[in-house]
Amino acid sequence: MIIVNTKTGKSGKEGKVNVSINHYTSFQQVYNYPEMASVNDWADYWNEAATLIPGVSGFGENDPSQATPIGDISGIPEVDWQDLITRDGRIDNTDINISGNTGKTNYFISYNRFYQEGIIEGSGLERNSIRLNFDTKVNDKLRAGVRLALTDRRQEVNKVNFNQVYFNILPIRQIYDVNGNYTAVNPISGTTQRNPVSDINHRIRHRFVTNILANAYAEYNILPDLTLRTSVGTNLTFNKFNRYVPTVDPIRNLQGTGGKADVDHSRKTGVLNENTLTYSKEIGAHSFKILAGFTLQKDTFSDLGAGGQGSANDVVTFNNLALGAISTTNTIN
């Protein structure tokens, strides 16, 4: 069972305004990094694998005449990719609440700001929320109220392929080559691989979400035992996701494919109208209630995705998809 308590301001002394402010800050840290083989252990393993032959025993043995992929092991610089892509995280949370009542009117207003710097470099979240609850007694027969919640969220989506860092990127692979450019190639297999440091510094992955939840109601006592209640509410969600891989991305730079941009927009709307008529009666030690009503509801969803690649520079990033040599679109309604 989940019980949700809605604050309305009724509990305060009439005519008094109550204000409360709460804040906390916390920190996050990777407690235990997975233990990875040292560069020397890793190099020894690869050299042994490269010189392994069946041998007369059938169990395999190393042939010293075979060429080894890694020569001078002692001179290999080691790159700690785990350390490069992580950091100490931080969370800040602030709540401000204002409530009160004037006898016939109760109100509650709150503001919340949540800010997080993720433990992965370049990731984070900022959320701002405003909530309003308002109830008033217009006269002896009529009561009305409003519920409103606004939330705006900006997320710096993780730019790093974390699995690749653990399972594919070698500790002997350097961040930069001798010319100061980001490396893009596995030094053993020769295949292209993303560079996590380049991803963190240059890729763009922004998500914006705005949600509006609103409801208004009115109750009217037609007779002492007969009450009409009507309410209308809406739930609106707007989502935008911007992504951009720049021209300086080592793989795209190596392949000469230019920048790549993608933008997704989605909108979800819902409208709900509820109408009820309630008759309540007590006769002696007995009571009964009759409820009748109807509901109207409509939900819609639309999504538009567009992309472009082949842009010659990173000046406008995802803000002008027409600059791309290749364009794509996808629409859902």
Indicate residue ranges for each PLM-predicted region.
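Short, charged beta->alpha transition segments
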Residues: 94-97, 187
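Surface-exposed loop/interface segments of Gram-negative outer-membrane beta-barrel transport/assembly proteins
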Residues: 11-77, 118-213, 231-333
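N-terminal entry motif of extracellular EGF-like repeats
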Residues: 80-81
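Outer-membrane beta-barrel channels and translocator barrels
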Residues: 9, 91, 102-103, 139, ...
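A beta-strand signature from Gram-negative outer-membrane beta-barrel systems
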Residues: 1-20, 91-93, 114-117
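Outer-membrane beta-barrel initiation region
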Residues: 84-88, 98-102
